[in-house]
Each structure stands twice: as C-alpha cells, then as structure tokens.
Amino acid sequence: MSLFQNVSFMTTNNPKIISEGLTYDDVLLVPHYSEVLPREVSTQSYFSRNIPLNVPIVSAAMDTVTESAMAIAIAREGGIGVLHKNMTIEEQALQVRKVKRAESGMIIDPVTLSLTSTVGDAKLCMKEHSIGGIPIVDDAGILKGIVTNRDLRFERDKNRPITQVMTGENLITAPEGISMKDAEKILESHKIEKLPVVNKDYKLVGLITFRDIANLQSKSVSNKDSIGRLRVAAALGVTLDAVERAEALVHAGVDAVVIDTAHGHTRGVVAVLKKVKERFPQLDVVVGNIATAEAAIYLAEAGADAVKVGIGPGSICTTRVVAGVGYPQLSAVMQVAAALKENNLQIPVIADGGIRYTGDIVKAIAAGADCVMLGSLLAGIKESPGETIIFEGRKFKSYRGMGSVEAMQHGSKDRYFQDVEDDIKKLVPEGIVGLSLIHI
C-alpha cells in the first residue's frame, strides 16, 4: 500500500496545501499617531487562564535555560519561568520549592529539622535549600527553637546536637494571621531576621524573614501568588508518570504545568491533559506545541488553559529540516489567536521560538500572542544552568535544543515521541548543541 494513498498531493490550486506564511523577519509594524506615552503603557498579560504576568516574558522549559535560578530571576521581573523536566520527579519538585521559598510574604511550609538533628544536618539542609535559618520542631510540629547560619558559622563538629546551638529560650515568635507591617515591627525591634509564626498551640505554621519583607517593598513588579510567593511553572511529558509528576509539583506549590511536546495536536497529548485536569481541576495546564488553528481549537475544547505555538522556529531546533514539518511562526500565531477569538475560546496564546531580537517580541504580541517564550536570548546569562566554556578568551554557555541527542539522553525523548528507543544510534535528533556568549 502506498504511503500517500489517502493523501492529497500538493498542488498550487489547493490553498490548504500551498499558502503564504510569514515569519518575524518578513514584517515591520507601521507607526501611527498615539495618545499613549511609553511610560503609560501596561505590560500586564496572562501566561494561562488564571496565571497573570506583569511582563509578557516566559523562559523556556529547556535544560540549558530554566532551572530555579532562572525562574526566580524571571518572576522577580514580572514574568514566569517553566522548569524543564530533564530531571527526576523529586529533583523537579525541589526546584519548584526553591522558587516558592526564594521570597514570600510568609513561607507557609518552611523547611524544619527535628530535635535529634545535628549541626551537619543543618548545614547540609541550608546548602540544599539555599536558606539561612531553620526552625526546630518536635514530632508534633511544636516549635522548640531556631538555628541560623550565624549559629553555625564557627561550628566545626558536625555531630554536635542541634539543640546545643539553636536559640531555644526567649524565642521571638508571631501569632498566626499577623500582618506584614506588624511582623516588620517585631523584626526591627528585636533586631532579628527570622520570625517563626505559631498557632495558639505553639505549632509552627510559617516563617517570615526580613529579606522577604524587603523584597516585597522593593520589587512591586514581581510576579507573585496570593500569599506573596514567586510564581513558577514546570514541564510535563506525555509519559506514564505524567500524573505522578504533576502531583509532586502541585504539592511543591507549582502554579501551572506545561505539557511539552513537539506535536501537541495528538490523541496522546489530550489524554494526558484530561488525566491531569481530572486529578487537579484547579491547576492551570498549558499545552504545546502547535502551529494551526485547528489544533488550538481542539486543545482549548479539551480543557487546555493556554496553548503554546511554534513548531521548528527555534534557533537550535531542526524539526523543519529533519521532519519537513512546521509553519512560519508569525502566521501561526496570527491564525491561532484569530481562531480562538472567533470561537469564543478565551485562553492565552504563547509564542514559542524564533525570537531573535526584542522587536520580534513586539511583532509576536501584535500578531495576537499574550506572551512570548524565550530560549536563546536567555541562554547566555548567569542564571541559566548551561555549562560555562572558555573559547579564545571569551566565555560561553552551552545551549542545546531539547531535540538534540544530548538532551534526549537526559530525558526529553518523549517530547519527540522516541521514548521507546533505548539505542542512542537509532535516535533521530531534531535539535543541535551550540554556544551562547555570556552577557556581562
């Protein structure tokens, strides 16, 4: 049987087969008279149905772009980062916790240690979670003390009981429900940096830090949730453990998940979408990637809270060359945005890929995108997790497509529907590895 038996051959007479498509380099915006001054422009938008943005910037779910450091930096500037999934479920959940604890009005679920812990346990815990203070509780969760990095600075004996170095007597605490203004007064009057919050039974319910209060005052543009924590999203794959991964991420405090595949207009993707939405109906689920109006309508009607548009436009993506599949990015964004509006399916559109210059961001938004996802533009900054390489006296960071062999070896095979293939020689890469000059 011929492979093309039921496929219409390409003819210039069929507009569905041959049509004009535009990418960012093909167009410019024509200026017109405006009553709005630049400083009066609002950059607020949406990442997904219920997740707002103060700037329409999202960092890509790539293992050389977004881990906790990048997600924290992006959220502080008003955007959101999508943590990549080339790590274990536990590691990805830990990355979420790092972002949620980076700054907040009050840490709802602070890291704690038991009374049987040692100095070594405390030092390891502080290093692992990038924190400077740990409440000490008993088996019932009753607050018994607090240990800070100042208490441990000159401690050489790792086996010394934590009860011998913690502050246990005359411990300063705050009652449950205290306002940030009153908490700040307590911190200032007692010259302390950590303030445990307890209920009427003296059970630990939270932790307020002076740094978090200072950040709340200095970074009004930061993208934060209802209790003052930085927002963060994380990627899922079309895998058997997708719901398990989503559950761990939700428990860690993730604000949204992204079902991240090279071809989102498939039965398998919608099956995962429905499973995740059934298990977590309040969780926003973004789905991608797609390139057509039909795909956007299909996913929106299936329950997606946003769609991610872009097949092959990225600088290190070779899908269009290897698979012969794709669509000019600007036209794809325009058609998806128009189709959702015409069908009264009001979910955000994320333009993913092909953004080489700042002007491309403007063009994408003008075409109908609610926000843009950046990869290469962020790969060369200090917050990106890529390996630093020195070449001819200049510093670079490695940057690779999630369809590269190197990335697929670390967990992204399912994104390109090759997760059943264990022989590296049989993998068909749809991405390359490159270097990005580190920006000073």
Where would I find each of the regions flagged by the language model?
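An N-cap/entry alpha-helix motif that binds or orients negatively charged groups
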Residues: 2-57, 89-91, 109
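Bateman/CBS regulatory modules and CBS-like beta-alpha motifs in cytosolic regions of diverse proteins
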Residues: 39-53, 60-62, 91-129, 136-138, ...
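Short beta-strand/loop segments at the ligand-binding rim of alpha/beta enzyme cores
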Residues: 54-57, 106, 226-234, 278-291, ...
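Glycine-rich beta-to-alpha transition loops that act as phosphate-gripper elements at the mouths
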Residues: 61-66, 113-117, 174-178, 235-240, ...
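Catalytic cores of alpha/beta
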Residues: 70-71, 244-245, 249, 292-305, ...
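Glycine-rich phosphate-binding active-site loops on the catalytic face of alpha/beta enzymes
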Residues: 82-88, 261-265, 309-323, 357, ...
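Active-site-adjacent beta->alpha loops and helix N-cap segments on the catalytic face
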Residues: 89-95, 210-221, 243, 262-280, ...
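Conserved small/polar residues in nucleotide/adenosyl-binding loops
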Residues: 438-440
